[in-house]
């Protein structure tokens, strides 16, 4: 299982990456593996304000449909529109081309509450 050390994680299997004043968000390799082949992604709208812990979309696979939760509070400034036609990018590259959304105006307390890769990995055992 791939687990980049430079990302932060949630117990719900989302990852967060600081990116020059904004934060890129996706689901972990573990999560995509558990879901199986992803066939559809419901994305939030650009301009939406999302609240940590709230469902902000869904990911549909051949096995199930799973809600996607906001790991931090912030404003959606971009979504990965490529996922509309190629949702399988989450399976093939969850930490790069399979990113889901980008937030700004993120509450710093939410970021500091996220898990390091080591702490996230311990929770998988």
Swiss-Prot record:
The keyword NADP does not apply. The keyword Aminoacyl-tRNA synthetase does not apply. Binds 1 lipoyl cofactor covalently. Keywords: Lipoyl. Gene3D superfamilies: 2.40.50.100. Belongs to the GcvH family. The glycine cleavage system catalyzes the degradation of glycine. The H protein shuttles the methylamine group of glycine from the P protein to the T protein. Is also involved in protein lipoylation via its role as an octanoyl/lipoyl carrier protein intermediate. This is Glycine cleavage system H protein. It comes from Listeria welshimeri serovar 6b (strain ATCC 35897 / DSM 20650 / CCUG 15529 / CIP 8149 / NCTC 11857 / SLCC 5334 / V8). The gene is gcvH.
């Amino acid at each position: 299982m791939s687990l980049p050390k430079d990302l932060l994680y949630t117990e719900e299997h989302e990852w967060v990456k600081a990116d020059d004043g904004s934060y890129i968000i996706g689901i972990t390799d573990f999560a995509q593996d558990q879901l199986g082949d992803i066939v559809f992604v419901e994305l939030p709208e650009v301009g939406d304000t999302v609240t940590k812990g709230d469902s902000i979309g869904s990911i549909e696979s051949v096995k199930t449909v799973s809600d996607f939760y906001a790991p931090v509070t912030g404003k959606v400034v971009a979504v990965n529109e490529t996922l509309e036609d190629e949702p399988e990018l989450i399976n093939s590259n969850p930490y790069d081309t399979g990113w889901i959304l980008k937030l700004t105006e993120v509450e710093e307390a939410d970021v500091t509450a996220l898990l390091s890769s080591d702490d996230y990995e311990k929770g998988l055992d």
